[in-house]
C-alpha cells in the first residue's frame, strides 16, 4: 500500500500552519458614555447660556430668603410682634424648605431635574405673590412657609449645571454662581431701601416675584440632564441633547454608540446610608447643618445688630416701645426701629463680602482640594464670630460682618460643589435634597439664636455659632472622599 509522502516539519511549515488556522478577530463597535461626550464636546456657548439661566435661580432664591431680613422690622411694628414671633417667620420658611427638599430630591431622581425645577418656580412665584395680600401675621407665616417649600426645588438648577459641565470647569464655574446669589441679595436690599419707605413692604414682595416669573419662561432653552436620561434608559433623548450641545458649542461628538449603564432603582434613601457612602453622608449632613446655621445666623444677626443697635451690647435708646392693650398687664414690647439709609448701606457693604473671597475660594478648591479648603474657611468663620464680640466702631463692625459674609459664602460654595460631585447620578438629586433638608434645620434654629438669644447675651450667641463652625471644620477635614479632579460617577 502506497503512502503519501509527508513534508518534513520545519519552523517555516509551523509558521504557515499557525497563520492558516488563526481565527479572524471580530472588531467591536466603538462606544462612549455621557461622561466621554461631555468631556469631548468641551466648554462653549451652551454652557454660558446654562450658567446664566440656571445661575439666575440663585437670584430668585436669594431675594426670597433675604426678604425676611429686610421686612422683619416692618412686620414687627405692624402686627406688634415679640422676638420669638419674628424669629418664627424665618423658622417656618426653612421648615417648608426642609420638608420639600427631600420630596423634590426624590421626585427629581425619578422624573427629572428640569420638571421639578419648573414646578418649584411656579409654586414659589404663586405663593410669594399671595404673601403680599396676607391679612394677618398667621396668614403671613403660612404663606411664607409655602414659599419655602417652593424655593427648596431651586437646587435642581445647580445639579443640571453640574451634570453638563466638563470636569476641569466645575471647580471654576460653580463657585462663580455665587455672583447670582450676591446679585439677588443686593437687589432685594436696594429695592427695600426704596420701596418700603414709599409704597410699603407688600409692594416689595410683589416686585420681588418678577424675576422668578421671567425665569420660568427662560427654562425652555435648557434641556433635561443627559446624565439623567441615560441613567433612566432614555438614551435617545440623551443623545439628542448631547448633539444639540455639540452643535451649539461648534464641537463634535465622540465616535461610536452611546451606551447606558446597568439600570438601578432610583432615588432610594437607603442608598445614602449604604456602607460605601454612610460616613460621607453623615459628615456631609453635619457640615450642611452647621454651614446653614452660621450663614443665616450672620444675615439675621446683622439685621438684628442694626435694628436694635446692639454694638458692644448696648440697646439703642431710640427704639420706640409699643405695648399692646390698655392695661399694665400687657407688657409685650415691640421695638419699632426702622432701617435708616445708613443701615441699608451697611447691609449692602457686608453682602458684597460674599464675593470678596471668591477668587481665593476658586483657587483653594482647585489646588488644595474641596476638603481642606472647606475646613480652612470653616475654621476662619469660627474665629470671626468671636471677633464680632469685640467692642469696636461702626466701621469695625462692618469690617467683621464683611469678612463673615465672605467666609460663610465660601463655605456654601464648597459644600455645594462637593455634595454634587460625591454622589452618583442615580442618587445625586436625593443626596442634594436630603443635605438641603438637614441644612434647613440649622436655618430654622438660627433665628432664635440671632433674634432671641442675642438680645439677652451677644457673647453666648456668638460662642455658640463659633463652636458649631469648629465642629464643621473637623468634619470637613476628615471627609473620606476627595472629589477634586474626579469624574462624576454615573451609577453606585
Swiss-Prot record:
It is found in: Membrane. The chain crosses the membrane at residues 48-68, 86-106, 121-141, 179-199, 203-223, 281-301, 348-368, 383-403, 429-449, 458-478. The keyword Membrane applies. Its main location: membrane. InterPro entries: MFS, MFS_dom, MFS_sugar_transport-like, MFS_trans_sf. GO terms for cellular component: membrane. It is a multi-pass membrane protein. Pfam families: MFS_1, Sugar_tr. GO terms for molecular function: transmembrane transporter activity. Keywords: Membrane, Transmembrane, Transmembrane helix, Transport. SUPFAM superfamilies: MFS general substrate transporter (SSF103473). Belongs to the major facilitator superfamily. This is Putative transporter SVOPL. The gene is SVOPL.
Amino acid at each position: 500500500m502506497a503512502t503519501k509522502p509527508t513534508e518534513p516539519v520545519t519552523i517555516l511549515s509551523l509558521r504557515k500552519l499557525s497563520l492558516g488556522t488563526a481565527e479572524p478577530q471580530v472588531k467591536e463597535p466603538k462606544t462612549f458614555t455621557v461622561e466621554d461626550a461631555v468631556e469631548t464636546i468641551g466648554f462653549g456657548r451652551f454652557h454660558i447660556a446654562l450658567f446664566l439661566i440656571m445661575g439666575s435661580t440663585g437670584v430668585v432664591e436669594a431675594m426670597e430668603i433675604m426678604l425676611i431680613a429686610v421686612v422683619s422690622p416692618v412686620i414687627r411694628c405692624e402686627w406688634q410682634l415679640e422676638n420669638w414671633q419674628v424669629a418664627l417667620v424665618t423658622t417656618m420658611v426653612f421648615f417648608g424648605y426642609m420638608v420639600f427638599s427631600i420630596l423634590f430630591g426624590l421626585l427629581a431622581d425619578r422624573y427629572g431635574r428640569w420638571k421639578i425645577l419648573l414646578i418649584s418656580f411656579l409654586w414659589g412665584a404663586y405663593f410669594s405673590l399671595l404673601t403680599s395680600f396676607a391679612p394677618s401675621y398667621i396668614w403671613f407665616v403660612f404663606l411664607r412657609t409655602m414659599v419655602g417649600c417652593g424655593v427648596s426645588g431651586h437646587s435642581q438648577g445647580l445639579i443640571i449645571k453640574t451634570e453638563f459641565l466638563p470636569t476641569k470647569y466645575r471647580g471654576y464655574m460653580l463657585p462663580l454662581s455665587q455672583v447670582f446669589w450676591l446679585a439677588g441679595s443686593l437687589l432685594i436690599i436696594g429695592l427695600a431701601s426704596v420701596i418700603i419707605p414709599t409704597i410699603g413692604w407688600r409692594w416689595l414682595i410683589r416686585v420681588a416675584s418678577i424675576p422668578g416669573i421671567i425665569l420660568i419662561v427662560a427654562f425652555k432653552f435648557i434641556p433635561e440632564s443627559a446624565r439623567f436620561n441615560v441613567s433612566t434608559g432614555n438614551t435617545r433623548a440623551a443623545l439628542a441633547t448631547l448633539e444639540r450641545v455639540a452643535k451649539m458649542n461648534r464641537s463634535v461628538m465622540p465616535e461610536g454608540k452611546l451606551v447606558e449603564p446597568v439600570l438601578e432603582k432610583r432615588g432610594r434613601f437607603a442608598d445614602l446610608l449604604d456602607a460605601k457612602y454612610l460616613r460621607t453622608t453623615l459628615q456631609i449632613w453635619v457640615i450642611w447643618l452647621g454651614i446653614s446655621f452660621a450663614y443665616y445666623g450672620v444675615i439675621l444677626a446683622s439685621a438684628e445688630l442694626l435694628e436694635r443697635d446692639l454694638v458692644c451690647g448696648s440697646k439703642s435708646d431710640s427704639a420706640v416701645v409699643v405695648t399692646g392693650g390698655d392695661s399694665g398687664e400687657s407688657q409685650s414690647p415691640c421695638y419699632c426701629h426702622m432701617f435708616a439709609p445708613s443701615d441699608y448701606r451697611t447691609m449692602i457693604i457686608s453682602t458684597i463680602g460674599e464675593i470678596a473671597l471668591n477668587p481665593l475660594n476658586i483657587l483653594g478648591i482647585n489646588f488644595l482640594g474641596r476638603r481642606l479648603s472647606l475646613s480652612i474657611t470653616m475654621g476662619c468663620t469660627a474665629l470671626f464670630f468671636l471677633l464680632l464680640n469685640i467692642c469696636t466702631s461702626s466701621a469695625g463692625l462692618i469690617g467683621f460682618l464683611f469678612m463673615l459674609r465672605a467666609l460663610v459664602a465660601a463655605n456654601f460654595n464648597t459644600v455645594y460643589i462637593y455634595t454634587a460631585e460625591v454622589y452618583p447620578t442615580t442618587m445625586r438629586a436625593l443626596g442634594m435634597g436630603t443635605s438641603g433638608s438637614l441644612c434647613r434645620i440649622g436655618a430654622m434654629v438660627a433665628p432664635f439664636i440671632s433674634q432671641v438669644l442675642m438680645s439677652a447675651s451677644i457673647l453666648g450667641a456668638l460662642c455658640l455659632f463659633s463652636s458649631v463652625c469648629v465642629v464643621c471644620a473637623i468634619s470637613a477635614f476628615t471627609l473620606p472622599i476627595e472629589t477634586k479632579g474626579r469624574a462624576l460617577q454615573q451609577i453606585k
